[in-house]
């Protein structure tokens, strides 16, 4: 008869790693755990194989795919991988809640809003895009610890926005890491499984998220099928190659015309454009660039673009293609629509703003009528909170 370890006394130091294997206490417990139905010293037995009881933590669309895979595994009675599945998500201003909560409610899964985590007993926790640090005391309540589905090849892109930074920096290879959570710091725990995929050319962060979310969900199920073995074979992250993926802000979306090349601007657009529209200044007004397009070579050969020195940020309306051409550090980008009080096509913007300006200032140089870099004050850094759950 299998009996699960009570949540309040889970002190099994599972998960391999050189540090724990060299610890005498870990070696002693490992020898004990090798015997069938080993006890933790308080009379409770630890389940040695599936089905597992899982507490899932997540919020967004990426996490939703992981939850969907866990739910499908729970519904598959033939495999007997998941016996119990409950969900923790953060509160949302929307009555519907975030994607994870929506899925949990639709699927009739028990769902708690952080910091409430319920009072059930679980074998293992799973985190995907949760964004909250968990205390060591809380992690130790899970006999098999807490796993994290992270959409990067750790240690590259530690932090809350790995997919965005993958696109932003022009990476050609992306991936997913299944790792074990450690307290006090994000994304530093032992790696249990890691796979890579090529980044499709000109992929947006949303498109790459869809690819990586499916990959990560499948990898997690694979790890859960051989959980004790996966934990014992975990490897520490290398010290080399560490990069960080901080959370984006409105300031991230501000184009620096004098500093950024057309390639960098398009990467920025593909990375954050679906979350925060790119922004700039026009005549002291903030203007959002909604639809960016690459400029055809035939347009770039126009004498208006090549016949004079043009200052970065200069705006020219190209009537034939009905786009705004904007000069950046090394080239031009095209803009099909903008938002200035309301959404305007490039033609609307020209007729309503550019053309009247030129009529009033017929002697002025085109360089005087240009987009300029919008400087937003950086957000104050907030202290990370480690929540010690009861």
From Swiss-Prot:
It catalyses: L-methionyl-tRNA(fMet) + (6R)-10-formyltetrahydrofolate = N-formyl-L-methionyl-tRNA(fMet) + (6S)-5,6,7,8-tetrahydrofolate + H(+). This is Methionyl-tRNA formyltransferase, mitochondrial. Methionyl-tRNA formyltransferase that formylates methionyl-tRNA in mitochondria and is crucial for translation initiation. Residues 1-33 form a transit peptide. Keywords: Mitochondrion, Protein biosynthesis, Transferase, Transit peptide. Its EC number is 2.1.2.9. It is an enzyme of class 2 (transferase).
